[in-house]
Design a protein with these regions (language model features):
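Residue-level detection of beta-strand scaffold positions
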Residues: 13, 29, 76-78, 92, ...
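Alpha-solenoid helical repeat architecture
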Residues: 21-23, 35-36, 71-74, 107-118, ...
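Amphipathic alpha-helical segments of tetratricopeptide repeats
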Residues: 26, 46-47, 59-63, 67, ...
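Hydrophobic core segments within long, regular secondary-structure runs in both alpha-
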Residues: 6, 10-13, 39, 55-63, ...
Length: 168
């Protein structure tokens, strides 16, 4: 049976994912050794976790697929947010480097605008936490310029950016 274990975990992860049990799906996906599907699940569900205040869970998931953060810009952005929300402020900028590299060589699309807005918002949050009002305002304004109203996660970040502008 040991040879069948990865396949059983893979099947369980698909079932859990299809039935809305994301945490269980990711746990089984990681146990199956399917890093690519784990990354996809994390990218697809990371924003919801952050909006529910589960930044620590998100950080644990991202650390389980650490090798992919360099090649997946959204994973890098989620990692930066997880660091910020868990108080690891000194690790936020380095987490954003892969996303910076990706976006600098990408065509402007809705996806890249959301990424740029998310990066500006986490930088605004970081500057605000450090008491740098000038940088917080600049990044918050930048975030508002990129983030669309029609995407739920982007709306949350727009609210954060607006709040930072009100605090500064």
């Amino acid at each position: 049976f040991p040879g069948q274990l990865p396949e059983l975990h893979r099947r369980a992860s698909r079932w859990y994912e299809q039935n809305g049990f994301v945490s269980e799906a990711i746990r089984h996906t990681l146990a199956a050794g399917d890093q690519n599907f784990a990354v996809q699940l994390i990218e697809d569900n990371g924003c919801q976790l952050m909006m529910r205040g589960e930044g620590f869970t998100l950080l644990n998931w991202i650390e389980a697929v650490e090798a992919h953060a360099e090649e997946r810009p959204w994973l890098a952005i989620l990692k930066a947010w997880a660091f910020a929300l868990n108080g690891y402020l000194d690790r936020v900028e380095s987490a954003l480097l892969p996303a910076d590299r990706f976006i600098s060589s990408s065509a402007p699309t809705l996806r890249t605008k959301i990424m740029l807005g998310s990066m500006a918002a986490v930088r605004a949050f970081l500057a605000n936490m450090r008491g740098d009002a000038g940088q917080a305002v600049a990044f918050a304004q930048q975030a508002l310029g990129y983030l669309p109203d029609r995407v739920p996660f982007a709306r949350s970040l727009r609210s954060l950016a607006t709040s930072i502008l009100g605090d500064a």
